[in-house]
Amino acid sequence: YFWVGFYVVRHGELQLGPFQGPLACFSIQCGRGVCGTSWAEARTLVVADVHAFPGHIACSSQSQSEIVVPVMKNGEVVAVIDVDSSDLDSFHEADQQGLEAIAQILGSLFPIG
């Protein structure tokens, strides 16, 4: 995976948080791209081919597949975990289960407000 990071809900949009990898999009609107759609729908999205995803935001030309997992606090999405791969179809059920477990722990630790 060439990019792993967080987008945090701030001021009505997702804003880039801690990440590892090349510089990424700074902000994403609700419902736009894989991250914004995961936020809007409050569910994990596993995308085998990002180029086939309607409205995909190409922050990096390296991105071929992606998984985005919402971090929930008190029933609301407060952040998303985003992992991008330079290979098609890189993410599977084990990846989803592991990242969702991490997101659940992070949600319980996330500051209120």
Residue ranges and their predicted role:
Residues 47-48, 73, 106, 110:
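Hydrophobic, well-ordered secondary-structure segments
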Residues 85-113:
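Juxtadomain coupling helices with adjacent low-complexity linkers
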Residues 50-51, 84-86:
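Anionic group-transfer/hydrolysis microenvironments
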Residues 3, 68, 80:
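Short hydrophobic/aromatic beta-strand element in the GNAT-like acyltransferase core
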Residues 65-72:
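A short, aliphatic-rich beta-strand micro-motif
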